[in-house]
Amino acid sequence: MKNLGYISCILLLLSIAGKAQQKTYCNPINIDYGFTPIPNFSEAGRHRATADPVITLFKGDYYLFSTNQWGYWWSSDMYNWHFVPRKFLKPYHKVYDELCAPAVFVLGDTLLVIGSTYEKNFPIWMSTNPRTDNWKEAVDSFRAGAWDPSFFLDDDNRLYLYHGSSNTYPLYGQEVDRHTLQPVGARQDLIKLHDEQHGWERFGEYNDNNFMPPFMEGAWVNKHNGRYYLQYGAPGTEFSGYADGVYISDHPLGPFTYQPHNPFSYKAGGFIRGAGHGATYQDKYHHWWHVSTMVINVKNNFERRIGIWPAGFDKDDILYCNTAFGDYPHYLPTEKEHGRFTGWMLLNYQHPVTVSSTYGAYYANNAVDESIKTYWCAATANTGEWIQTDLGAISNVNAIQINYADQDADILGKRTDIYHQYRLWQSADGRNWKLLVDKSRNKTDVPHDYIELPQPVRTRFIKLENIHMANGKFAISGLRIFGKGNGAPPTEIKSFTVLRQQSDKRNAWLKWYPSNDAYACNIYYGIAPDKLYTSIMVYNASEYYLKTLDKNTTYYFSIEPINENGVGKRSPVMKVE
């Protein structure tokens, strides 16, 4: 018994040490997303939802605010996020949005926040200790009445407000008195969309303007090398191509000029898509990052998540965001690390899956098809339901991401008393199983749990066993296993061709001979051979229709193959006029 106790203590210490050494993260970020609080948004099924994120570094911690969460999060490392429940609306605010697309800014030793409103009776709240629910009113009624607001404090201590969300009106800007926190003078028109020039600004899943004019929203401003970068989201939050663009000026209220590289934040491929309506910020080590909205759009247009990517300014002061492998594991920030891709590949794309049961048409293969929009669902949420994936060969497993889906949930709004419990098992032969991860006593809500193993494990089969569901049936949109296979990276893709439509240069058709040993590829393009900042991950295809180009811009393209063993050689850079 003493030996068993000793072994248990050692295993516990190793487990704690492994958790403390977490060095990576994976999008969508794993926070306890609240459920939509709006009844008519959940008619197709109650579901988690948030969007429009802002991350601000304040007193050594990162603070994350987003739409309709009945609170906010703080973190010391950008991985472990701690939720602080808080209602900012007053009883006379007869709206569901708590808060919608909040603005967060720092003045001295104080953090301030306000949500979107067209009314002029919303307070701006302030706190010097936001790790706890310790807030008071800075002003009881902000007279600007701004939707999708954001604030920017300039080097000279002048404060500016930027706002707007419309498919008719522009984004606005105006000065705000630093002391009274009230607007000064009239608002100014700043920028509007030009989708007749910019293909990516066109409305629709396929950028074809087939339903209504596109939306411009989510203003955000950063200053770099004396210039102001006014960022905005377009064309619609429900689309894979939801992205952030940027205009630049020498003055905080313009005039602004469209940056040649746009959109700067874009993620139209992969497991989860979208990278629009966000915020650009610096970490403790002065590295730049961009946080944005990611799209699910199954049970409602506003079913969304949050992603974080490394960003920066190049030698020509071009703002960019690196979304390549943007839902694979990346390194958390340190003094020397800035969101670098780990090189851990997806090991189980479209591999065999077995399950304990299936509910309706939510089939097992949906859990490994690399689409967050589809999911497998068990018949119940009972303890003992399970899903098992076969890697096809013994491989090095470094990390696992468990993406839960919402099926038969019954929650409206935020709950802080729900949690997931599970066990992960591994086997070399599918018969003899060893415990890999034990979260059977977990008491936290982890809808997109990501586990970096302390050491790589050599195995072939991974099984996820349900112990307790936070809400609804046991449903998984992605059981994603990351690591390295045993073979060689894929061979270079041949005959990569880009045909740009001459009658409408916003469009192009990309075609290639697929690599026989690749499951996906990354398409890269940009405005110069050394500025291929835009990337699109495409699974199991040999063509892609691209409708995001700026009409009068020359582009450069390249493509690389991907498999379980690594990344193949990029094709030569191709100029397309």
Outline where the language-model segments fall.
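Extracellular low-complexity, O-glycosylation-prone stalks/linkers
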Residues: 425-426, 514-536, 540
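Aromatic, loop-rich ligand-recognition surfaces of beta-strand-rich domains
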Residues: 369-437, 447-498, 503, 511-513, ...
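Beta-rich carbohydrate-recognition and catalytic domains
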Residues: 21-211, 223-270, 285, 293-336, ...
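Short S/T/G- and acidic-enriched coil/turn segments that sit immediately N-terminal to beta-strands
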Residues: 245, 420, 447-450, 540-545
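Predominantly extracellular/luminal regions of secreted and cell-surface proteins
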Residues: 172-184, 337-370
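Bacterial Sec-dependent N-terminal signal peptides
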Residues: 1-22
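Beta-strand-rich modules
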Residues: 546-567
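Short beta-strand segments enriched for Tyr within beta-sheet-rich domains
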Residues: 115, 228, 397, 521, ...
